[in-house]
Curated annotation (Swiss-Prot):
Family: Belongs to the universal ribosomal protein uS14 family.
Keyword Iron applies: no
Protein's name in the database: Small ribosomal subunit protein uS14
Keywords, alphabetical: Ribonucleoprotein, Ribosomal protein, RNA-binding, rRNA-binding
Lineage, highest ranks first: Bacteria, Pseudomonadati, Pseudomonadota, Alphaproteobacteria, Acetobacterales
Role, per record: Binds 16S rRNA, required for the assembly of 30S particles and may also be responsible for determining the conformation of the 16S rRNA at the A site.
Oligomeric form and interacting partners: Part of the 30S ribosomal subunit. Contacts proteins S3 and S10.
Coiled-coil residue spans: none
Signal sequence bounds: none
Biological process terms in GO annotation: translation
Gene Ontology cellular-component terms listed: cytoplasm; small ribosomal subunit
NCBIfam families tied to this protein: PRK08881.1 (NF006477)
A GO MF term: structural constituent of ribosome
């Protein structure tokens, strides 16, 4: 199990990223628009820099829904490899069977 504080911090970052998503996209579009004057683009980049760092999507870590483990996660199941193996071996994931050839 991961530390509860790490899981909560990641959840907070995910909330902030969702909240600030529209603002970040709008500012990035202004910054990348070459038809606008340099002053406007620079002002938009300053506003983007003023936004909190934790509001960025890249700071959110993919974590296991059961254990909170941050490594070896499968996006499709939102589980880490350890939890996925336990659930699959007990038959709790529909359609997943142990391979044999």
């Amino acid at each position: 199990m991961a530390k509860i504080s790490a899981v909560n911090r990641n959840a907070k970052r995910a909330r902030m990223a969702g909240r600030d998503k529209a603002k970040r996209i709008a500012l990035k579009n202004i910054i990348m628009d070459r038809t606008l004057p340099v002053e406007d683009r620079f002002e938009a980049s300053m506003k983007l820099a003023e936004l909190p760092r934790n509001g960025s999507r890249v700071r959110v870590r993919l974590r296991c829904k059961l254990t909170g483990r941050a490594r070896a996660n499968y996006r499709k199941f939102e589980l880490c490899r350890v939890a996925l193996r336990d659930l699959a071996s007990s038959g709790q994931i529909p359609g997943m069977v142990k391979s044999s050839w």
